[in-house]
């Protein structure tokens, strides 16, 4: 989730955008409960698709990206659950269900409730159905990892090795697999998708044009959704620009409920208030 910002001028009255990185950014103090949707908040934004006759009123949509952040967080948590080999097969299978996707409605392993920091969603399908990390991983060869593997293959290999360790750490190599899996996924999935897909070829005028819906029946235009998808991979809460750097950090660590709870309902909505 991200911590860099590049100035841009784009649709939703948002004045700056993070460069798809790694750390999570978030939300603002009690005053924001009443002024949560200011000019520095990412949405809501009205539907502008010509001829749209559905019931949707907000064109902002990036729930698939939020689901993948949750898959990443849950996978990182699972990577530390090995007992030294005894549970390796079961743990690997469970980790692969979060990496490769599952037909089951998987529980959110992280983030979860922490003190008065109450998370609204408890299962992945409450955010978005049918999402995975494997299908969005970098498809080229990763030269910096042995074996000439693709991004998805590297992550699958890391998962296999993590499952065989005790607590995710391999004392022979010094590899900390929760950290390796997390940091590699941030680059091979989130950064790669945002920078080398949505903010690259999909910004071409003839690719997902803004004069048409993103796909048939969609309530957002091509370029609206391209930008939303990139923002979603950045991993910031919708009102993160209203926060100081300290508040962003505190929310990422689940230590500042007031800053996180933009609408003041006492719950943290992973779709907009935290990722």
Per-region residue spans from a language model:
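Mature extracytoplasmic or organellar-lumen-exposed domains after removal of signal/transit peptides
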Residues: 36-275
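Sec/Tat signal peptide C-region and signal peptidase I cleavage site
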Residues: 30-36
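General helical secondary-structure elements
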Residues: 7-8, 64
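Bacterial N-terminal signal peptides
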Residues: 20-29
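N-terminal targeting leader peptides, primarily classical Sec-type signal peptides for secretion
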Residues: 1-4
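Bacterial N-terminal signal peptides that target proteins for export
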Residues: 9-21
């Amino acid at each position: 989730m991200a911590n860099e910002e590049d100035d841009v001028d784009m649709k939703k009255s948002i004045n700056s955008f993070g460069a798809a990185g790694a750390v999570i950014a978030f939300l603002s103090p009690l005053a924001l409960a009443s002024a949560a949707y200011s000019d520095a908040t990412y949405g809501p934004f009205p539907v502008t698709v010509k001829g749209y006759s559905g019931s949707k009123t907000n064109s902002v949509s990036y729930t698939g990206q939020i689901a993948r952040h949750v898959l990443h967080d849950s996978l990182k948590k699972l990577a530390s659950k090995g007992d030294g080999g005894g549970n390796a097969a079961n743990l690997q299978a469970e980790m692969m269900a979060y990496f490769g996707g599952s037909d089951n409605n998987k529980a959110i392993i992280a983030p979860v409730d922490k003190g008065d920091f109450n998370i609204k969603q408890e299962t992945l399908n409450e955010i978005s159905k049918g999402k995975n990390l494997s299908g969005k991983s970098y498809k080229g060869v990763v030269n910096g990892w042995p074996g000439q593997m693709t991004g998805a293959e590297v992550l699958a290999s890391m998962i296999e090795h993590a499952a065989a360790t005790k607590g995710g750490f391999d004392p022979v190599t010094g590899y900390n697999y929760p950290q390796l899996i997390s940091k590699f996924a941030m680059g091979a999935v989130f950064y790669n998708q945002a920078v080398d897909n949505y903010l690259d070829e999909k910004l071409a005028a003839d690719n997902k044009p803004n004069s048409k819906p993103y796909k048939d029946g969609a309530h957002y235009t091509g370029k609206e959704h391209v930008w939303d998808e990139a923002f979603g991979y950045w991993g910031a809460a919708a009102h993160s620009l209203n926060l100081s750097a300290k508040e962003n950090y505190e929310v990422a660590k689940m230590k500042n409920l007031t800053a996180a709870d933009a609408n003041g309902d006492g719950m943290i909505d992973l779709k907009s208030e935290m990722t």
